[in-house]
């Protein structure tokens, strides 16, 4: 999926107001799931996950489960690790 700047993203997204829904497909290349940081604080809610994991900088990965809510402070490095099936999340900034 290409963003407005012409960069490829490993997800599809749909924005509704201050909420963004993202879907990462089960066949996402693991090389696309890179360490990154965001400019704003984010609250991520897991809608669908089967073995996908989330990792903050200097912490061990945690398995994402449906209903989990993760607070990610701005400028904090983090990444996701691929599991089975799709990962569906909502992001509130």
Question: Residues of each region from the PLM?
Answer:
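Short, Lys/Arg-enriched N-terminal segments with co-localized hydrophobic residues
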Residues: 1-7
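Double-stranded beta-helix
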Residues: 8-24, 88-93
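Conserved short histidine dyad/triad with adjacent acidic residue
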Residues: 20-39
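Short, conserved beta-strand element in jelly-roll/cupin
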Residues: 38-53
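Well-ordered beta-strand positions
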Residues: 45-47, 63, 71, 81
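Short acidic-glycine-tyrosine-enriched beta hairpin
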Residues: 58-75
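Ligand-binding loop in jelly-roll beta-barrel domains
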Residues: 73-93
